[in-house]
């Protein structure tokens, strides 16, 4: 693992928006063209993507991971434990700051938040819940939030996040138990399907 000096929030944003691009949720242009200073506008690679609201509108979302650290070593994942990449994590305050500042500038209409597994599924889900609570209750953010449920986290934490988010989903890693055992031996089919059922039941 590459060790870095303390990072700025912008450096974290570059890493954790890039790490989120593999999370299925929405589409993005993928352009990296920067403004030359002679006009207006700037297409940076930081994770603004597009999704569709219930009424069919195309909306812009800040798409980030809370952390790219992970205790698992899934063979297909760029954030797997054994991959030698720069690791970092946001704090709940940093996610709130980014979301609110992007929203005030009319860059986004909402947030897409996923995460690697830091320490444990429950610990990670607690951090996500703390972030969503702060956004909704302290920052009074009423925009759209799509959050990924963390497989293996407790039912109570998943329900808590569900009350604060507009949409929840779970990454279905592989279609068969055999494939999951081969490519993601630390994960279980039961832990993936349990939050999916919970979300489906509302």
Put a short name on every predicted segment.
Residues 64, 69, 118, 151-152:
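Short, surface-exposed acidic/glycine-rich loop or hinge patches that mediate macromolecular interfaces
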